């Protein structure tokens, strides 16, 4: 029997009694955000809204984005990345479990020197894929052109964020490249690996 989202007590400053809020709202109040699912428009908009709101509330205090994601849609992932670069506070990224595809792109988008992976985390990079393989020829060509532009954008961001040469990142994105936390650190996707 599902119990829903757990609730925890929270007392606002100046209030005598605590109120019960769902655990995610409590964590958001501490500036802790979660990408724990496939990247899509809904989770992207939710994270963007939270980052913007929290940066307006306090533009000096860091945000923490915990990532355990198999990847997902490219455009919503790029929107999360762009928002991370736009907001005033630093966004620290933490990989726990898996950051694959768009998940690794968002992970790399954290403030350089503030990107962390748990010791047993896995990171995977690859090129963006299309689901329009049943489209008419004309549509398919347009889709392929757009996909090439997106691939170039993603590759250039990885080059900028990791310090790796363009040829290496481009070659690695040709296939699924899985990395341990230490390998992701050596590659430049994360800066630190948490100690066990």
Curated annotation (Swiss-Prot):
CDD domains: S14_ClpP_2. The active site is at 101 (nucleophile), 126. The keyword Repeat does not apply. Disulfide bonds: none annotated. One of its GO terms (cellular component) is chloroplast stroma. It catalyses: Hydrolysis of proteins to small peptides in the presence of ATP and magnesium. alpha-casein is the usual test substrate. In the absence of ATP, only oligopeptides shorter than five residues are hydrolyzed (such as succinyl-Leu-Tyr-|-NHMec, and Leu-Tyr-Leu-|-Tyr-Trp, in which cleavage of the -Tyr-|-Leu- and -Tyr-|-Trp bonds also occurs). Pfam families: CLP_protease. InterPro entries: ClpP, ClpP/crotonase-like_dom_sf, ClpP/TepA, ClpP_His_AS, ClpP_Ser_AS. Its EC number is 3.4.21.92. The keyword Transit peptide does not apply. It is found in: Plastid, Chloroplast stroma. Its main location: plastid. Keywords: Chloroplast, Hydrolase, Plastid, Protease, Serine protease. HAMAP family: ClpP (MF_00444). Component of the chloroplastic Clp protease core complex. Belongs to the peptidase S14 family. This is ATP-dependent Clp protease proteolytic subunit. The gene is clpP.
């Amino acid at each position: 029997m599902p119990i829903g989202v757990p609730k925890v007590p929270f007392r606002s400053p100046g209030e005598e009694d605590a109120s019960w809020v769902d655990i995610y709202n409590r964590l958001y109040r501490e500036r802790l955000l979660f990408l724990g699912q496939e990247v899509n428009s809904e989770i992207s908009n939710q994270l963007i809204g939270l980052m913007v709101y929290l940066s307006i509330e306090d533009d000096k205090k860091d945000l923490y984005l915990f990532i355990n994601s198999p990847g997902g849609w490219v455009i919503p992932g790029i929107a999360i990345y762009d928002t991370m670069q736009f907001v005033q506070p630093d966004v620290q990224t933490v990989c726990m479990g898996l950051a694959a595809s768009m998940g690794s792109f968002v992970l790399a988008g954290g403030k350089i020197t503030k990107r962390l992976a748990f010791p047993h985390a896995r990171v995977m990079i690859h090129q963006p894929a299309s689901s329009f393989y049943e489209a008419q020829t004309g549509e398919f060509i347009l889709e392929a052109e757009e996909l090439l532009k997106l691939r170039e954008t993603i590759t250039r961001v990885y080059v900028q964020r990791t310090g790796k040469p363009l040829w290496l990142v481009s070659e690695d994105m040709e296939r699924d490249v899985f990395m341990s936390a230490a390998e992701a650190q050596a590659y430049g996707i994360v800066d630190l690996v948490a100690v066990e």
